Amino acid sequence: MEWKLNLLLYLALFFFLLFLLFLLLFVVIKQLKNSVANTAGTLQPGRLSLHREPWGFNNEQAV
C-alpha cells in the first residue's frame, strides 16, 4: 500500500515539475517574440527611430 502512495507522490511531483517547465518555456518564448517584434518595429525603414546613444551624444553632435 505504501509503494502506491509513493508512486502517486512521485507522479504528482513529476507532472507538477513538467507543468512548471512548460510554463517557463511559454513565458520565455512570449518574451522572445515580444523582443523580436520590438526590434523589427524599430528597424522598419519608413519609421523614424528614437534610438539614443547610451553616452548621450546625437549623431550631429558627434561630427
Curated annotation (Swiss-Prot):
Cysteines paired by S-S bonds: none
Main location as per UniProt: membrane
Pfam families membership: SMIM43 (PF21976)
Signal peptide: none
The keyword Transmembrane is assigned to this record: yes
Membrane-spanning segments: 9-29
Gene Ontology annotations for the cellular component aspect, listed alphabetically: plasma membrane
GO biological process: mesendoderm development; positive regulation of D-glucose transmembrane transport
Role summary: Required for mesendoderm differentiation. Interacts with glucose transporters and promotes glucose uptake. Probably augments the glucose uptake capacity of glucose transporter proteins to meet the energy needs of mesendoderm differentiation.
Origin organism lineage: Eukaryota, Metazoa, Chordata, Craniata, Vertebrata
A GO molecular function held by the record: transmembrane transporter binding
Tissue: Accumulates in the posterior primitive streak of mid-gastrulation embryos at 7.0 dpc. In the adult, highly abundant and enriched in the brain compared to other organs.
Protein name (record): Small integral membrane protein 43
Quaternary state and interactors: Interacts with glucose transporters SLC2A1/GLUT1 and SLC2A3/GLUT3; the interactions may promote SLC2A1- and SLC2A3-mediated glucose transport to meet the energy needs of mesendoderm differentiation.
Compartmental location: Cell membrane
Keyword hit for Mitochondrion: no
InterPro entries reported in the protein's UniProt record: SMIM43
Start and end residues of each stretch annotated as Important for interaction with SLC2A1 and SLC2A3: 7-29, 51-57
Key words of the record: Cell membrane, Membrane, Transmembrane, Transmembrane helix
Membrane topology qualifier: Single-pass membrane protein
Organism, scientific name: Mus musculus
